[in-house]
Amino acid sequence: MKRKTILWWGRFDPNYSRNSIIRKHLIDLNYKIIDFKPLVSKFGYMEANFRGVETPDLVWVPCFRHRDILSARKWSAQRNIKLLFDPLISSWDKEVHEKNRVYSQELSDKLRSKESALFKEADIVLSDTSVHADLFRRKLGLSKVKNPIVYVGAEENLFKPFPKNIATDRKFDVLFYGSFISLHGAEIIVRAANLISNQLDVKWTLLGNGPNLKECKRLAEELPNVFFEDNISYSNLPERINRADLLLGIFGDSTKAGSVIPNKVFQSLACGKTVITRCSDAYPEK
């Protein structure tokens, strides 16, 4: 039986976790993957024709590559090939709601209409949560487009339980790691630590860097049980997760924060750790 071929189209990062996880599973399912990274997204279809890119069974535009959609659609339509888009985010939703930029209703509607037309170019649009799927259908009009949910997941060959090193004199380590953006709500973690600051047998560790780190450090100035660690390499992250006793997810109160299940939740669960995160409709009921 001939192997089916999937053409990954766009100026994407194959090592980004969403991409690497999906690509590994596709390869495990015996799909052949071809990469095409156009020099200029807008003229990708011309470059693909010039370079004689192999005709695949499916064209896949990976996450964040909204600007590659139209060119990929033009090329795939000429060959009667289906186009799949894995956006991971709505640019309109991020611009208007997550970044809290002030737009008139008219301009917001124009941005939404533009993205709706873009998404409708695809035959299949993946969602990473049921909330995003609902957003794509209600706000971007994708009811007639196949819109399955594929969760972000984790690289299970990397994120897995390590042998336990039991030490009776160590403190209970509560770990948060991330980029300290508003979606993460790291300040809420520091405030929670303050509520039990008298329990010195609990160590709160916040690992990473980002725009809200300075504020978190300010809030933690008088807290003896809150510690900060610098960024570490991605390959060392599983070991650090396994050293912790409890992992923390995200606690932002924005609509966006309620729409996602972050990588850290899947990674920590894959390491066999208990995770506390905010409640939202994004999480499966079972």
Spans of features found by a protein language model:
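Conserved donor-binding/catalytic core segment of Leloir-type glycosyltransferases
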Residues: 7, 167-193, 204-205
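Nucleotide-activated donor-binding/catalytic signature segment of Leloir-type glycosyltransferases, i.e.
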Residues: 214-239, 243-246
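Membrane-proximal helix-turn-helix segments that form the acceptor-binding/catalytic region
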Residues: 48-50, 74-78, 105-125
